[in-house]
UniProtKB/Swiss-Prot annotation:
Keywords: Glycosidase, Hydrolase
Function: Component of a beta-galactosidase.
Protein name: Beta-galactosidase large subunit
One Gene Ontology CC term in the entry: beta-galactosidase complex
Underlying gene: lacL
The enzyme's E.C. designation: 3.2.1.23
GO process terms (BP): lactose catabolic process
Active site (catalytic residues): E465, E533
Organism: Latilactobacillus sakei (Lactobacillus sakei)
Assembly and oligomerization: Heterodimer of a large (LacL) and a small subunit (LacM).
MF terms (GO), sorted A to Z: beta-galactosidase activity
Family in the record: Belongs to the glycosyl hydrolase 2 family.
Length: 625
């Protein structure tokens, strides 16, 4: 297939040549590698690449992927990094409106009577910046003579990929991994990878989150070798009997390549407690009963077990060994109250954007570790990944720390239904448009398939502030069908109550007052109540928190919420007059339209210094640990 620039304009094309989403488990060549958490099957492509910036698609170097192309005009750029923070593009923060409002008239594809009005909307726009990346690499010895895929863990917003002059594929969905098979065109040395990233595409209508509007390759890029027998996908489904405190594990495994033996081991924190042997068929579905009482997982006791699957050949040599931590816990609704392991669940939560004051949404494992430690010392027991999937490593950290997760799908179309504060959903997407269904469901599928093994995830969230419609009904049904062990969350049906019966297991609101919450709970409530956003911490805020905390003792069906939000979105810049480093917020970069200091709602400053408001959080959340 040949690439088409008009893929940018239509929601019908969102993945081309992309491999199916799968579990995020890691795998190793030896037991020693697994012990060190260093896999020889992985090769990082992070580092210095070559780069060219174009203001639109028409002016981009169209043949830059060809091996004979002269890239002398390209400049060095660090990957991962936002293109804006490399100095090529204006910084821009906005909350609700689409970033082009006031500059261009645009409506989502298929939302008007003109079913062709979207053609050229982004592909022919006079302003839709393009980043053209080139990177030359040699394969490490361990990756040679094997199947090799490339994983982009985060690219905003639409990308085309070539290797050695051959088109590989196309991907949207900025915040989940995109993988492509490079094997047919790969060489041992002097490979030329070309990636073309477009700032906006039809996906911009459903990635309208409250944040700085960056683009580029902003998360890790790596190569992954697949040995001759490979575990493609792994789903550990622990089942926990709360009364008996016993457990069993369902395993759904998908292998590729040669059929070989597999040694299965389950470890607790001290020793191996279960072993079994199986064969690496294409599909494996097995059930294993734990031999003794199990230790449940919760915020207070984040007990983890570890599954190991070692593939061995006929000579007994290890081909591959995979590892997946998991835990036993049960989340359910009984008598309209959410229970975790048989006890009422109280959410002392916070919404969290990924952020660093110098690198934006390009963050590190150290940043994540600081955030989790900060939550723990301030009695924050839950996090909502607002409003997109986070880096893979953050989910592991929450598993280990006992932080409850609301795992949000990358979906927000705020500007399509709320205009200048008024609810006006006449061209809301995805809404009930068939043409938007596949792209939207693909985002749910990728979110689920990638993170399904993480015990910390109690809720799948359909997204944020996208109103409602039949497409979200189908998202809800997808999550419920795939994973009945978790709850599904969505707030937007509050504004479209005709969908309340078919979307969301919980009554979720934003910024409802204590009086409004009481009114719901005093009038035949049908679902447990949570606040997916509350206590908007902008400026010197967070007063009145006790009014919400008191409700926890008054109503069993009121089960807490997620403060907005954890960290300011602000950037450290050098003032040209004083030479001092200072934090700048939305609107400080001559970015228009903008919502200005609305980017600064965190309990901690962008520099990760706690604000005084955090004292309130520590005190009140500490009452209901």
């Amino acid at each position: 297939m040949q690439p088409n620039i008009q893929w940018l304009d239509t929601p019908a094309v969102f993945r081309v040549g992309q491999l199916p989403a799968h579990s995020d488990h890691r795998y190793y060549a030896t037991l020693a590698e697994m012990a060190q958490q260093q896999s020889s099957f992985e090769q990082s492509l992070n580092g210095t690449w070559q780069f060219h910036y174009s203001v639109n698609a028409a002016s981009r170097p169209k043949s830059f992927y060809e091996l004979a192309f002269d890239a002398q005009d390209f400049e060095p750029i660090t990957v991962p990094q936002h293109i804006e923070l490399a100095g090529y593009e204006q910084l821009h923060y906005i909350n609700t409106m689409y970033p082009w409002e006031g500059h261009y008239y645009r409506r989502p594809a298929f939302s008007t009577s003109d079913d062709k009005q979207h053609l050229g909307m982004f592909s022919e726009a006079d302003y839709n910046p393009v980043g053209s990346y080139l990177h030359h690499f040699d394969l490490t010895p361990a990756l040679r003579n094997q199947r090799v895929i490339i994983r982009f863990e985060g690219v905003e917003q639409a990308m085309y990929v070539w290797l050695n002059g051959q088109f590989i594929g196309y991907a949207e969905d900025s915040f989940t991994p995109s993988e492509f098979d490079l094997t047919p065109y790969l060489k041992e040395t002097d490979n030329c990878l070309a990636v073309e990233v477009h700032k906006r595409s039809s996906a911009a209508f459903i990635e309208d989150q409250d944040f700085f509007r960056f683009f580029g390759i902003f998360r890790d890029v790596k190569l992954l070798a697949k040995p001759r027998t490979h575990l493609e996908d792994l789903w550990v489904i622990p089942e926990y009997d709360v009364v008996q405190q016993t457990g069993q594990v369902k395993l759904r495994l998908q292998f590729s390549g040669d059929e070989n033996r597999v040694h299965l081991r389950i470890r607790d924190q001290h020793q191996i407690i279960l072993t079994a042997d199986l064969t690496s068929g294409a599909q494996v579905n097995d059930l294993y009963k734990m031999p003794e009482l199990v230790q449940a997982w919760s915020n207070q006791t984040p007990n983890l077990y570890t599954l190991e699957l070692e593939v061995v050949d006929q000579a007994g040599e290890t081909i591959e060994i995979s590892q997946q931590p998991f835990g036993f816990r049960k989340i359910e609704i009984k008598d309209k109250v959410m229970l975790l392991n048989g006890k009422r669940l109280v959410i002392n939560g916070v919404n969290r954007h990924e952020w660093h004051p110098e690198t934006g949404r390009t963050i590190t494992a150290e940043d994540e570790a600081w955030d989790i430690a900060c939550m723990q010392r301030n009695h924050i027991n839950a996090v909502r990944t607002s409003h997109y999937p986070d880096r893979l490593s953050f989910y592991n950290g929450c598993d280990q720390a006992g932080i409850y997760m609301m795992a949000e799908t990358n979906l927000e179309s705020h500007g399509s239904w709320q205009k200048m504060g008024a609810v006006e959903p006449s061209w809301n997407v995805p809404g009930s448009y068939d043409e938007w269904e596949a792209a939207t469901l693909d985002r749910a599928r990728t979110n689920f398939e990638t993170f399904k093994n993480h015990v910390s995830i109690l809720f799948w969230s359909l997204g944020n502030e996208s109103y409602a419609g039949s497409v979200l009904e189908k998202m809800n049904a997808y999550y419920k069908q795939q994973d009945p062990t978790r709850l599904v969350h969505y707030e937007g049906v509050f504004r479209a109550p005709e969908y309340k019966a078919t979307i969301s297991d919980v009554e979720s609101r934003m910024y409802a007052t204590p009086a409004e919450i009481k009114a719901y709970l005093d009038n035949a409530p049908q679902k447990p109540f949570i606040l997916c956003e509350y206590m908007h911490d902008m400026g010197n805020s967070l007063g009145g928190m006790q009014s919400y905390i008191d409700l926890l003792s008054q109503y069993d069906m009121y089960q807490g919420g997620f403060i907005w939000d954890f960290i300011d979105q602000a950037l450290l810049v050098t003032d040209p007059v004083t030479g001092q480093r200072e934090l700048r917020y939305g609107g400080d970069f001559d970015d228009r339209p903008s919502d200005y200091e609305f980017s600064g709602d965190g309990l901690v400053f962008a520099t990760r210094d706690e604000k005084p408001a955090m004292q309130e959080v520590r005190y009140y959340y500490g009452e209901h640990k």
